[in-house]
Amino acid sequence: LYPIFPADDPAQVTAFTGLYWYVLPLPAGVVLLGTGWLFLRRARALTEQTPEIIGLWVALVLFGFGGVIGFFESSVDTRTPAHYHAELIGVTLVFMCLYFALFMPLLDRPVPARKWRIASYVLLGTGQLFHSLGLFSAGLDGVARKVAGGEQGLDSAAKLSSMALMGVGGLVAVIGGVIFVVLAARCLLIQPELAASDVAEHATDVA
């Protein structure tokens, strides 16, 4: 576009905006559709394998949601943090899954029970989904970002409900994050002589 438009031509800005809206999402859309199709095709085999597949499903949904609402964000209200919080936690969930599915086995460390891993993924992911949904809804009603207290202008039931949803979702997400931190710390700090018994317990749990 630089050879086509002069640097001071407003049409150049319009052209780059068009690329942002209509071209940039295409690669991500192809990857998401392909991944979703693969998951659906092998859903039964994957879900019976490890809890990390559930975590990846949650991450995929959350990341997709964040991407969609990103098209409706504004730089002045809470729709912007709704978008990037969903995207960041979606990526974080993927690394959480890798932590237990790849990194811990490579270090010969024990892996926690299935139910606790699933709990951390689901609580963090669903909590963040509601957190972002509340922020996005509040932004639609004009609640400004980067302000607190009376400056938020929570003068209607809709705004209060949206911010309440944000708070509840944030609390649920924090609980999921704390569970992960405790599990991760235990994996790293557990005594070597106890690792064998934990691995055996995990194998029985998976079976």
Name what the model sees in each region:
Residues 24-30, 157-178:
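Hydrophobic alpha-helical transmembrane segments
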Residues 32-33, 64:
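Secondary-structure boundary elements
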Residues 64, 88, 125, 137, ...:
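Short glycine/serine/threonine-biased micro-segments
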